[in-house]
Structures are given as C-alpha cells and as structure tokens.
Design a protein with these regions (language model features):
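Periplasmic-binding protein-like
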Residues: 111-124, 142-145, 197-201, 248-264, ...
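Beta-alpha junction/loop-to-helix N-cap segments that form part of ligand/metal-binding clefts
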Residues: 34-36, 63-67, 83-155, 231-235
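Bacterial signal peptide processing site
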Residues: 26-29
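C-terminal motif of bacterial Sec signal peptides marking the signal peptidase cleavage site
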Residues: 21-24
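Segments of small-molecule ligand-sensing domains
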Residues: 327-336, 347-411
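Extracytoplasmic "Venus flytrap"
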Residues: 33-73, 97-102, 202-208, 332-337
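Extracellular/periplasmic periplasmic-binding protein-like sensory domains
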Residues: 162-165, 267-343, 416-419, 424-429
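Extracytoplasmic ligand/sensor domains, especially the bilobed periplasmic-binding protein
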Residues: 117-229, 278-297
Length: 430
C-alpha cells in the first residue's frame, strides 16, 4: 500500500476509539438518512447493485466517517444522470454498521446474501469483522478506507491506497507486520528545514503505541524528537504548550482525538506558542477545521495535512471541479473526494469488462490487479496491488500536501506527483 497511509489509517481508527471513550456515546442521525434511494429500472437493462458499508452512527459521531459514502453516492448519482453504466443504472445499497463487529457482520450478510450486491465500494468501517465473509464470497470491495488491517490481509479487498502485502487471508501484511514510510517527515525536513518535532499522546496504550511509531519515523529521518504525554483523564495541556515553546519545536504531531487537539491548541494560544507546522491527517482534511479551531487561530493557520489524493480545493484540476460540482453546496472533505474516486474506480473497471467479454467479478478484479497503476483521472497518487513475498526496505513515494490559510482554506503545496522521495520502510504491528 502507499507507505505511511496504513499507519495513518490505523491512527484514524485509534483517534476514533479515543473519542469514543471521551464522549461515551455519539450523536445518531435519523435512520432515513441511510435509506437506499429508490431507483427506476433503466432502459438499458437491470440495475447494477453495489453496496456501501459505513460506520455512520458509531459512537464517534454521525459525520465522522460518512465522507467516503457521500462522495461515492454523489459519483453514482452523476453517473446515473448521464445514463448510467452503458445504459444500466447503478443502484446503491447503503448499510450503517454502527461501528461494531456485530453490526458489520450484519451489513455484510444483508448486502451480499440478501441484496446480492455485485461489489462493495468505499467501505468505511471501524470494525471490519465481516471482511473474511466478503473474501469468502469473492465479492470485490473497492476503494475502502483501511481503518483496520483487513485491506492488507484478505483477497478481494482493495483499499483506496493500494497494497503490497500478499493478502492471503492469514496474518496482516507480512507475518503480522505492516510497513510505513517516512516520506512525511522527509518532506518537512527538505521543504521547511524542520529539525525538531514533538509528538503528543495520552498515557493510554493505543495512543502511546502510535506515538512511538511516529517518533521512530522522525528519528529515522534525523529529527530531534520531543515526546510529550498527558494524562488521559486530566490532561495538562498548558504544561505541554510551555515545553513546546522552551524546546523550540518546529513540527507538532499527535496521537490524540480532535477534542484533545483543540484543547492543546487553545493552551498554545493562551501562552502565545507557535510552531511552523501542526501536521494532521486526511481524516481532518475538511472545511470543518475552521469551526473546530475557532478559538485557536494561531494553531489553525499552522495546520498542515498530508495524504495520497489531490486537494479537494484544487479547482485548477478538471477532475476536482467535476467532484465539487456534483457535491453542490455541501461542506467538502478529502474523504468525500476519495469516496468519489472509489466509485470511479469501480465504474472504470466495470466499463472495461463491458467493452470485452462481459461483466463478471473476476473481470473487475483483473482490472484492479493490473500492473498499471490507477489514478482516478489524477485524483489519486498511483495505486497498485503487488502481492510481494517480502516487504520492501525502501520505496519511492509521493505525497499530497496542503496547509490551511484563512480566507483561502486548504492550499496545496506543490504538485503531489512531484513531492516525492525514496524513503525507508519501518515495520509496525497493528
């Protein structure tokens, strides 16, 4: 998979779990928000049914994980408005698993065994307990968000960032070890001259484990690393902010939820502490950060984000413009764009089959497993599935980078196809 994205995705799951512990139970959207939209029979044949599993009403809140689903649905709506897939409408069946393993298994059963979907698209599941069932059924799962190691474990599952792992259904990755690269840290050292970085975590096992992974990557790139840890129940963020100032930190990373990040930034604001960059991940690459960090403008304007897809505010790109037009006036996020790309990926695969011997799951998977990388019209950095027997020691990897600017939103920093470096791959156990 794209180096560092597996680790970052695990971090997204970690932050979701931490937020679950903080809020106890999350907001729930009305069930009608997740009903399957009615679809008329097309003139070109029976509808082609696809499924989308999302942890929509999980304890992390109703909007936290719905971006990929919303982006995929927008793509299929636009496709159907143009006549569908060679005359066949795409009928989208959604299922909310509630963020639990039991709910996920129920969604897999409903979509595959009862609704007989041809494929799954843009899965975003906190607990992908049903992954073995999807693999056993031979149903392709295309463009899912790798919040668990399932996309580096099972056949027939194709995560949005690709994978190099064997994916035979045994242990994740290579014997239970996954690998991530150091390209994020390399970029900030090369482009911003950063040499001192802090990693803030809770004194909680999962948070501390991810913080160690980040610290190891920073040290591998020669950074001086300042490890900061706060009490999970009674965090003293003012003390952390003061230490960041005293240690002259350039970059700030974290293994905390959004609530903790905002409180840290407010403490930094109160003490007048500034860093060159507060680096976050694709899950927070959205327009909501202006609201989240409203009381910490200094922190807001030092927010940087990295990922493997083109900035959803890059209106100079025609594929981004098409995405934005389809989304209308809705608040936008990077996960929506990646859901849109996942739906495009399925459509391109299916269309290649219709142009040949016919549409089958096997043919769709042949398209996904091609040696040629997939880019979704340039929305994604090149994605491929390699099935390497051994993990790579180094990899040439590119990076999409943006920073927040008041009045402009997320502003891209160079072309993602040129923000590249050959970096070491570091092992970690999910």
């Amino acid at each position: 998979m794209s180096p560092f994205r597996a680790a970052e995705a695990v971090a997204a799951l970690l932050l979701a779990v931490l937020l679950t512990l903080l809020v106890g139970c999350g907001s729930r959207l009305p069930e009608r928000a997740f009903e399957t939209r009615p679809t008329a029979n097309p003139s070109g044949g029976e509808p082609l049914r696809v499924g989308i599993i999302t942890s929509a009403t999980s304890p992390v809140g109703g909007q936290a994980l719905t971006g990929p689903r919303d982006g995929a649905r927008a793509y299929f709506d636009a496709l159907n408005a143009r006549g569908g897939l060679d005359g066949r409408r795409i009928e989208v069946e959604t299922c909310d698993d509630g963020g639990s393993g039991v709910g996920n298994n129920a969604c897999v059963h409903r979509l595959i065994d009862e609704r007989h979907v041809f494929a799954l698209v843009a899965t975003t599941a906190l607990n992908y307990a049903g992954a073995p069932l999807v693999a056993k059924a031979g149903v392709p799962d295309i463009g899912g968000q790798p919040l668990t190691p399932a996309y580096d474990t099972y056949p027939h599952l194709y995560g949005i960032y690709g994978s190099s792992a064997p994916r035979t259904g045994g242990k994740p990755g290579w014997g239970g070890t996954l690998y991530g690269g150091t390209e994020v840290y390399r970029w900030f050292e090369r482009e911003k001259g950063a040499r001192t970085a802090a990693v803030v975590s809770y004194n909680q096992a999962a948070s501390a484990a991810y913080a160690r992974l980040v610290s190891d990557g920073l040290r591998a790139e020669g950074y001086k690393v300042v490890d900061e840890q706060v009490d999970f129940a009674l965090p003293n963020f003012r003390a952390v902010a003061a230490d960041l100032r005293d240690r002259k930190v350039d970059l700030l990373f974290d293994a905390m939820d959004t609530h903790g990040n905002v409180r840290l930034c407010e403490a930094m604001e109160a003490l007048g502490v500034r860093v060159d960059a507060k680096v976050t991940n694709v899950q927070n690459w959205s327009s909501s950060v202006a609201r989240d960090y409203a009381r910490a403008p200094g922190c807001l304007n030092s927010l940087w984000v990295t990922g493997s897809s083109r900035n959803h505010q890059d209106t100079g790109d025609p594929a981004v413009r098409e995405f934005r037009a389809a989304m209308g006036q809705r608040p936008l996020s990077q996960w929506q764009l990646e859901g849109w790309a996942a739906a495009m990926w399925f459509t391109d695969a299916a269309r290649s089959c219709l142009a040949g011997a016919g549409l089958t799951r096997g043919c769709v998977e042949e398209f996904l497993n091609r040696p040629e990388p997939y880019t979704a019209r340039g929305l994604l950095l090149p994605v491929r599935f390699e099935h390497l027997a051994r993990p790579p020691e180094t990899r040439h990897t590119c990076l999409s980078v943006a920073r927040w600017e008041d009045g402009r939103g997320w502003v891209g920093q160079g072309d993602m196809t040129e923000n590249c470096a050959t970096v070491p791959q570091l092992g970690y156990r999910p």
